[in-house]
C-alpha cells in the first residue's frame, strides 16, 4: 500500500512537471511569434538573421504545440477508458465480495434443502395442531357464573354507580288525582281545593 502511494505521488509530480514544461514552451512560442510580428511591422527583412531565428523558433514551437495538443487529447481519451475499466473491475470485485458472504445460497443443493426444511416445519405444525386437539378433550370446561354470583355482580355494579344530583323527570299532578288537566290552567275553585 505504501509503495502504491509513492507511485501515485511520483505520477502526479511527473504530470505537474510535464504541464509546467508545456506551459513554458507555449509562452516561448508566443514570444517568438510576437517578435516576428513586431519585426514584420517594423519592416525588417525576412532574410535578416534575427527575423529568421525568431521565425524558425516560432514555427518549431507551433508544431510542437500542435503535437502536444494531439497527445493530450489521446491521453485524455486513454485516461477516460482506464477510469471506466477501473470502475467496472472495482464494481465486480465489490459484487464478488458481497456474494462471498452468501455462498450457501448459491450452492446447488440449497433449494432442495430449503424445500425439505419447509416440509418438515409444515408437518410439525400439523402434529402440534393434532396434539392440541387431542389434549383439549381432556381439559375441564370453563365454569360460568351461577345465578347467585350474577345477582351479586349486578348489586356491586349498582352500588358503584354515581348517584344523580336530580331526577331527569319532573313529577306533576295528573288530571285523575287532582281533577285538573295538566294542559288547562287552574281556576279559583280548583286552587281553593288544592289549598284545603
UniProtKB/Swiss-Prot annotation:
It comes from the Viruses. Keywords: Host cytoplasm, Host nucleus, Virion, Virion tegument. The keyword Acetylation does not apply. Residues 162-196 are annotated as: Disordered. It is found in: Virion tegument; Host cytoplasm; Host nucleus. Residues 175-196 have a biased composition (Polar residues). GO terms for cellular component: host cell cytoplasm; host cell nucleus; viral tegument. It holds the Pfam family Herpes_UL14. Disulfide bonds: none annotated. Its main location: virion. InterPro entries: Herpes_UL14. Belongs to the alphaherpesvirinae HHV-1 UL14 protein family. This is Tegument protein UL14.
Amino acid at each position: 500500500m505504501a509503495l502504491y502511494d509513492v507511485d501515485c505521488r511520483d505520477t502526479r509530480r511527473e504530470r505537474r512537471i510535464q504541464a509546467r514544461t508545456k506551459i513554458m514552451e507555449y509562452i516561448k512560442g508566443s514570444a517568438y511569434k510576437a517578435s516576428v510580428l513586431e519585426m514584420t511591422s517594423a519592416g525588417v527583412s525576412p532574410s535578416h538573421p534575427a527575423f529568421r531565428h525568431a521565425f524558425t523558433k516560432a514555427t518549431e514551437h507551433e508544431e510542437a504545440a500542435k503535437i502536444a495538443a494531439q497527445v493530450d487529447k489521446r491521453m485524455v481519451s486513454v485516461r477516460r477508458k482506464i477510469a471506466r475499466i477501473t470502475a467496472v473491475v472495482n464494481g465486480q470485485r465489490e459484487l464478488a465480495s458481497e456474494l462471498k458472504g452468501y455462498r450457501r445460497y448459491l450452492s446447488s443443493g440449497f433449494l432442495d434443502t430449503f424445500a425439505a426444511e419447509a416440509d418438515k416445519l409444515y408437518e410439525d405444525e400439523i402434529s402440534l395442531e393434532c396434539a392440541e386437539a387431542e389434549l383439549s378433550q381432556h381439559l375441564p370446561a370453563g365454569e360460568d357464573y351461577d345465578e347467585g354470583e350474577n345477582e351479586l355482580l349486578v348489586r356491586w355494579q349498582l352500588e358503584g354507580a354515581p348517584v344523580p344530583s336530580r331526577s331527569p323527570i319532573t313529577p306533576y299532578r295528573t288530571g285523575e288525582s287532582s281533577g285538573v288537566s295538566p294542559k288547562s290552567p287552574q281556576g279559583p275553585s280548583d286552587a281553593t281545593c288544592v289549598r284545603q
